[in-house]
Amino acid sequence: MSEVIKIANCSGFYGDNLSIAKKMVEGGPIDVLTGDYLAELTMTILYNQKMKRGENLGYVGTFLKQFRDVAKLCNDQKIKIVSNAGGLNPASMAAEVENIIKELNLDLKVAYIDGDDLMPRLDELSSSGEKLKNIDKNNDLFSYEKKPLTANAYLGAWGIKEALDNGADVVICPRVTDAAVVIGPAAWKFNWSRNDYDQLAGALAAGHIIECGAQATGGNYSFFKEVPTFKDIGYPIAEINQDGSFIITKHPNTGGLVSVGTVTAQLLYEIGSPAYVNPDVISHFDTLKIEQEAEDRVFVSGCRGSSPPKDHKVCINLAGGFRNGTELLLTGLDIEEKAKLITETIFDSVGGKEQFDKVDIQLHRTDKENPESNEQAQAFLRIDVMSQNPDLVGRLFSAKIIELALANFPGWTGRSGVVPSGPYIEYWPALVDSKFIKEKVHFDGKTMEVIPTSQLDFEEVYYQKEPAEVKQITENPDTEIFFGDIFGTRSGDKGGCANLGVWSKNCLLYTSDAADDVRS
């Protein structure tokens, strides 16, 4: 085995480009092909799939097409496949993968992992004193009136390593952390121990960078004009070394860009702190050194790691209720009065605002004072209503709005299909004590239990960051430029919780007055 493991990612979400898997396998040498398909609310899509189409479903079906495209190539080139496309039903997904292997007469061995699904154990957890409090709101799940539909713990990487150690060629995962599909193969390759925290932290950083696909290679990049071409954009590859350092790159002759900027941007994605927490390790992103080694090759080193926490994060999706709404265009004079008139009339006709659980009214003044076109003359009024009672926000609510079309403000214009209607989901992030996690690997007729690191007898280690020295700069007279010319941003979300990461093009800008304005 070589001293580097090359891990390529072919998917950043359920709906990503299906052709990428084949392109990653055919585009150059790789050791592992990974794919991330599970955003938080994707779990409810898979839940609805099971409810409507059968209990044997609940996985990411499009992965099967990708697998069929690459199975023979991966078999011939000894490329491992690790994916979280198992979703809510990794066992069924594994069975479908095995059917394709038999059909193609290949010699690939399949493992699957489960133990993330906490729905059958909610009563047990409640009686054991677990509150599953909402991380953002501090509410107790079991005293909340809304019904959970899915509840899945984010499993770590050690089940994946166990499967690979036992000879699996394909590992089908359920809800694991996004980076676990990268950490697991790296830990397998180098036979890392549970407390090799610096190495694991490096692999976590690598996994975090490549897990959203083309976002690491120029997609959604603030300085998009630096990207030579977006045609046939290359997806990211992490070349991980035994010490946890790594190179981010892409296949040659593909579009996109791998630069210090694109890597930095993706490091800031979906994080709330430089100490990035996973069930296997805490990775301190503020210890990373990021260097441009060559064109489309960025070397990342120096990552420090700490012991993992004693709890696992849980993604819970609740049946939030039902919603409806409308969006109306208001044109010409007296926009505020028109908005007030139609809003009052709508709620008078349906029986008042008080009957709804939530009412959201937003008037967006996109109109201009002296418009040169009809579009410049328009503002838009958006009205959203939510209720646990589907009848209150159903077809009757829509009908009451439509029947005002000839009987209210002048110039009535509605926009259809803009405001979502029907059931809605409420995302509930929580923590559960890791002692309740029962992760299992199923392979070759055997079942192996994987105990979380925090439940093993390892000394707790927490890296204490040394303050970085940043040179002060001499500021010249002010010049007015756009903020976005010198600072980049990357937004990310976990369900209903969003973050915005901001970075400066160089360290000196970090000490400027402009950076102080950002921090304040």
Which residues does each predicted region cover?
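Gly-rich Lys/Arg/Thr-decorated short loops/hinges at beta-loop-alpha junctions or inter-strand turns
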Residues: S2, L41-N56, L118-K146
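A conserved active-site cap/scaffold subdomain adjacent to cofactor or substrate pockets
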Residues: I210-E293
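Single conserved hydrophobic/aromatic residue that forms the stacking wall/gate
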Residues: Y510, A514-R519
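N-terminal amphipathic/basic leader segments beginning at the initiator methionine
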Residues: S2-K22
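C-terminal amphipathic alpha-helical interaction region
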Residues: L392-D493, A498
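Flexible, glycine/charged-enriched surface loops at secondary-structure junctions
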Residues: D107-V110, A216-K231, P274-Q292, S349-H364, ...
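Catalytic or ion-translocation cores adjacent to nucleophile or general acid/base/metal-coordination motifs
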Residues: E103-L118, I183-F224
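C-terminal catalytic subdomain
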Residues: D296-D360, F380-D384, D391-L396, G496-W503
